[in-house]
Amino acid sequence: MAGRARATMKDVAALAGVSPKTVSNVVTGTVFVRPETVERVEAAMTELHFVPNLSARGLRNGRSGTIAVALPDLATPYSAELLHDLVEVAHERGLAVQVEETGAEPGREVELLSRARAHLIDGLILNPIRVEDSAVEYADHLPPVVLIGEVEQRVTDHVIVDSRAASRDITRHVISRGARRIAAIGGDENPEKETAASRLRLDGYRDALRDAGIEPDPRLEINPLPWTTPSAAAAVDGLIASGVEFDAVVAFTDTLALGVLHSLATHGKRVPDDVLVTGFDDVEMARFSSPALTTIGFDLRRVAEEALSLLNRRMTERTAPARSVTVPYELIVRASTGD
C-alpha cells in the first residue's frame, strides 16, 4: 500500500485558514506575522507532519537556511543560557543553527567567516573576546556577521550591554553597604590577560571607587585565567594568604563569584557579615548559591532577538550602515550583599 502523500504548504494553509504566502512567512521568519496566526500555522504543520524544505527555499532565495553561532567557551553557564535563547529564537524564525566554539582563537573565526563567504552558512553571530585580535577587525568584504559582547568596534552590527556602567553601579552598591576595601576578581593591569569584558568592568569598578573618594589598590585587582570557578577560588585563597584586607569582592562573572563564595566559606568568612560578594550575568545558579548572589542581570532572550534581527537585516541589506543595539541591564540585589 502506498504511503501517505507528503503534506505541502498549500495543505498547511488550507488547514490553518491562511494563504500559502502566510505559511511561507511563518517558515522563513522574515516577515512579521501575528502571534495568533503563527500559532494556527504551527499547529497545522504539526498535525500534518509538515517539514519545510529548507534546501528548496535556499535555491529560490540564495540562502542555505543555516546560520552559525560561535562563542569562546561553550562550557560556561552564561554561554549555555545564551546559546539556548539564540537557538530557540533562530528556530522560531525558520533557521537552523550550527554551533561553534572558537576558544578565543582568531584562526577559528577566519574559518567561520570564510565558510559564510562561500555561502555554506547565511551568516554568523560571533562573540569575540578581544576585537583587536579578532578576524572581524581585519576582514575585508565581511559576510553577514553580528557581534555580541563587550567588544568596541564600528566594523559590523553589534549587540552589547553597557558593562562599564553596570560594573560601576554594582560597585557603588557595595560601597553604599559600607564596603571600602573592595577586591575586583576578573581584571588587572596585565595587557596579556585583558579582554574587552575585563577592561570595561575594571574601568567601571575604578569609576565607582574614585567617585566615592577611594583610591584603587592594585593588590585588590586580580584577573585569574581562565575565568572559572576554581581559578577564582584559588585567587581569593591567595588574597587571604597575602594578608591584604578586604571587606567586599566584586567578581566580573557569576562563575567567578561562585569560586569566591567557596573560598570565603573554606576560610570561615561569612557572607555578607564579613565580606560582601557580587557577580555579573545573573545565570541560573546565581539564584541558588548560598547565599543567593547579588548580580547584574539582563535579558538574554532580548540579546538573541536583537542579534537575529540585525543578522536578518544584514543578510537582506548588505550595504546598510553598521548598527549597535544596547540591551538594558538591572542590579539584582540578593543575600550576598545583605538584602
State what each model feature region is:
Residues 1-66, 338:
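N-terminal helix-turn-helix DNA-binding module of bacterial transcription factors
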Residues 22, 68, 125, 183-184, ...:
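Conserved beta-strand positions in the central sheet of alpha/beta enzyme cores
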Residues 59, 73, 104, 130, ...:
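Conserved beta-strand edge residues that scaffold enzyme active sites
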Residues 1-7, 39, 54, 62, ...:
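Alpha-helical recognition/docking segments in bacterial nutrient-uptake
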Residues 1-2, 47, 88-93, 144-147, ...:
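Bacterial carbohydrate/catabolite-sensing allosteric modules
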Residues 19, 65, 122, 179-181, ...:
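Short acidic/polar active-site loop segments enriched in Thr and Asp
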Residues 11, 29, 105, 162-163, ...:
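Acidic/polar helix N-cap motif
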